[in-house]
Regions:
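Membrane-embedded beta-strand positions of outer-membrane beta-barrel proteins
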Residues: 24-28, 54, 72-76, 99, ...
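Repeated loop/turn-to-beta-strand initiation elements of outer-membrane beta-barrel proteins
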Residues: 64-70, 164-170
């Protein structure tokens, strides 16, 4: 998998990009995330955890390489996800890099429909289990102990662009890796994070 990602990045790096083909912007959104686990055959899913994402994005017109309407977009985001439970919650903050191949369907000069999908990689930079004990908050680190820091998954987006600058979208992303580091003799433990989000971006 790492070789595939490196090969894709190498191909993108060799493409000659003109100023007209590349746009930059800022992006942010609201997350509704869930932590899903399966231990010893028992499935547990958290309630929705409300987080956020914020960062910068770049978009490259791919019409010259495929057909009219195709584009490649990449973002560098701080993405706060996690899970909520009765009396506790989990904060999972990732430095995340999604790279999507998308298609733009233009209805008029001012309105376009956008659809895109692709992989993402994430590095956990903040991870805490937060529990209330006797009225006090007890925080426990999770990355490197309960969960691994590296995440890899798929990302899907659907939205609109108006006036060639403002983008509004809905998205969904989910882990493909088992994030759990918990080991139970004679059994298995699996943890994944899913996230539904709404967001906006302003392109310069």
């Amino acid at each position: 998998m790492k070789r595939i990602i490196i090969a894709l990045l190498a191909v993108v790096a060799t493409i000659n990009v003109s100023a007209q083909e590349l746009r930059w912007g800022v992006a942010g959104g609201l997350n509704f995330a869930n932590e899903r686990a399966k231990t010893a055959g028992v499935k547990v899913s958290s309630d929705s955890y409300i987080g956020f994402q914020v960062g910068a994005k770049a978009e490259m017109d791919f019409s010259s390489y495929l057909t009219d309407g195709f584009f490649l977009e990449g973002s560098l985001l701080y993405n706060l996800k996690g899970g909520s439970y009765s009396g506790s919650h989990t904060n999972l903050g990732y430095l995340q890099l999604p790279v999507n191949l998308g298609y733009r369907l233009t209805f008029s000069g001012d309105v376009s429909l956008l659809a895109s999908l692709g992989p993402y990689v994430g590095l956990g930079v903040l991870g805490k289990d937060v529990e209330k004990v006797s009225g006090a908050k007890v925080k426990t680190d999770v990355f490197g102990t309960r969960l691994q820091r590296f995440d890899f998954g798929l990302n899907y987006k659907l939205g609109v662009e108006v006036w060639d600058q403002w983008q509004f979208y809905l998205g969904f992303e989910h882990s493909l890796l088992n994030l759990s580091k918990t080991k139970i003799e004679g059994s298995s433990s699996r943890t994944r994070v899913t996230n539904f989000y709404i967001g906006t971006a302003y392109m310069f």
